Amino acid sequence: MGLLGYFRSDIPKKSSAKLAKDRLQIIVAHEHSNAVCPAYLPEMQNEIIEVIRKFMKISNDDVKCEFSDNAEDDMSVLEVNITLPKNR
């Protein structure tokens, strides 16, 4: 084996385009997972509360909103829990 044999590898190397694509996908997935909640979420929550208030009396404390983002399934979930009054 010559001197250049030490620098060569039997493992096929990825092309620079493939390597760049893989790195970009990792960065995009990381940025997507760091997104806590969309900017429109507070406004949406207020509008949901206003629609429900047309039909029954509730306070802001009766509404719990939770936003979760699952990067694996490429799905976002907005869960809204409303404690309804006993006398509807």
Curated annotation (Swiss-Prot):
State the protein's purpose: Prevents the cell division inhibition by proteins MinC and MinD at internal division sites while permitting inhibition at polar sites. This ensures cell division at the proper site by restricting the formation of a division septum at the midpoint of the long axis of the cell.
Xref: HAMAP family: MinE
- What does the UniProt keyword field contain? Cell cycle, Cell division
Identify this protein by name: Cell division topological specificity factor
List, alphabetically, the Gene3D superfamilies matched. Answer: Cell division topological specificity factor MinE (3.30.1070.10)
Give the matching InterPro entries. Answer: MinE, MinE_sf
| UniProt keyword Cell division present | yes
Q: Which family would the database say this protein is a member of?
A: Belongs to the MinE family.
The UniProt entry's GO biological process terms, in alphabetical order, are: cell division; regulation of division septum assembly
